[in-house]
Amino acid sequence: MTRGPLYAVSPLDGRYARYTEPLTEHASEAALIRARIEVEVEYLIALADLEATPLTLDESTRSDLRDLHDQFDADDASVVKQLETDGYAGYSATNHDVKAVEYFLRLHLPDEETQGPWVHFGLTSEDV
C-alpha cells in the first residue's frame, strides 16, 4: 500500500510538497547540516587566527575546509547522517546531529590528532 500525502509528517511535505520543494535546498536537514559545517569551519579558522591558541591551519587547509561547505552534496550529507546514526570511519554513532558534523570535519583535517580537538572547542550545539 502506498501512503500518500495524508500520511506525511505535516501538510508542508504532504499536500503542499509541490510548492515547498524549491525550499528544500534552504530548509531541509541537509541544508541545516551544510549551514552547521559553514559555522564550524569559520569558527575553527577564527580560532587558528588567534595568537592565544596553538592551532595552525595553512591556506590549503583553510581552502579545503571552506570547500566542504561550498561543494557540500548529498553524499556528504549521507556521511554526516551515518556518523550520527550508525558510525563511520572508526567513529561510533554519535546519536547527536551537531557531534556528527564535528566528526565529519575532523575526518577532513590533515592532522586530526592536533587539530581535531579544536573543532567545536568552546561551543555548544545552540551556538552552531
Report residues per predicted region.
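A helix-coil-helix interface module used to build multimeric assemblies
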Residues: 1-128
